[in-house]
């Protein structure tokens, strides 16, 4: 396992119990994200089975299942997969989850899915152009003819120019107790950085700080779109947030 892959697996393993805390209201965010993604997909009875290849604790998978889509989810983090399974059970949603690597999708059948998604800036965890191309090739192989790909990524153009070293903190309140979420970026080279994510919670006994570290490679939405084209996907375009209502730009593509 490559060092960056191992680091990111540990990043998400350690975050599994806390991931929902980066949202003001995780359930409300799930509903918004699910509605935005559904606008880019055919209705459930037409699209068939959807595969979420970076499902994490289930944010998008559960949201789509809740509005009638048939969804499978996979992720490199076994700990997050376990939580996604618990969340699906607690919500009585029929949504299956398993461990897999988006670069190979070894557990995904060829030509099985009507759509494949990878949201929340998942692809920039991949450490090379070859890894991104492999991911799109695995997606294409797993799609039905005409199947859709949706990938959301951070709009890195401004960050690459200005070399930001932190993101502004966001402040939430949980029944009167405060919560602060912020990021520090340690740049390794002109593209790669280690993100330090801090979740600071106020409790009756004081403040508790949770720290998680992962690695990203800043790849712009336009670059991601070119990789999708190179991998043989068609009708590739980048949709800005203003067009979709999703919080990140979305790259949309189709299998031949």
What are these model-derived regions, one by one?
Residues 2-56:
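Conserved class I S-adenosyl-L-methionine
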Residues 61-104:
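Class I SAM-dependent methyltransferase SAM/SAH-binding core
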Residues 107-115:
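A short acidic, Gly/Pro-enriched loop at the edge of an enzyme's catalytic core
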Residues 114-130:
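A short SAM/SAH-binding and catalytic strip from SAM-dependent methyltransferases
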Residues 133-145:
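A short glycine-rich, Lys/Arg-flanked "PGG" loop and its adjoining helix->strand segment in the class I
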Residues 150-222:
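SAM-dependent methyltransferase
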Residues 217-256:
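C-terminal lobe and adjacent flexible extensions of AdoMet/dcAdoMet transferase-like proteins
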């Amino acid at each position: 396992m490559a060092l960056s892959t191992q680091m990111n697996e540990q990043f998400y393993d350690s975050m599994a119990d806390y991931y929902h805390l980066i949202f003001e209201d995780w359930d409300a965010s799930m509903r918004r994200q699910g509605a935005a993604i559904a606008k880019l997909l055919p209705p459930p009875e037409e699209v068939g089975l959807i595969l979420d290849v970076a499902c994490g604790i289930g944010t998008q998978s559960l949201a789509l299942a809740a509005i009638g889509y048939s969804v499978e989810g996979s992720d490199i983090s076994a700990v997050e997969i376990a939580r996604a399974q618990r969340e699906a059970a607690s919500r009585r949603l029929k949504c299956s989850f398993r461990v897999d690597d988006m670069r190979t999708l070894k557990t995904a059948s060829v030509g099985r899915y009507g759509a494949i998604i990878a949201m929340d800036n998942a692809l920039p965890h991949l450490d090379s152009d070859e890894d991104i191309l492999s991911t799109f090739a695995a997606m294409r192989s797993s799609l039905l003819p005409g199947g859709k790909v949706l990938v959301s990524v951070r709009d890195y153009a401004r960050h690459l120019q200005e070399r930001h070293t932190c993101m502004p903190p966001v402040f939430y309140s949980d029944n009167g107790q405060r919560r602060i979420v912020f990021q520090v970026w340690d740049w390794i080279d002109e593209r790669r950085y280690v993100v330090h994510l801090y979740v600071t919670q106020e409790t009756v006994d004081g403040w508790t700080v949770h720290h998680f570290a992962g690695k990203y490679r800043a790849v712009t939405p336009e670059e991601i779109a070119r990789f999708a084209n190179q991998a043989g996907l068609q009708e590739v375009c980048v949709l800005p947030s203003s067009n979709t209502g999703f919080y990140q730009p979305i790259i949309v593509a189709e299998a031949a």
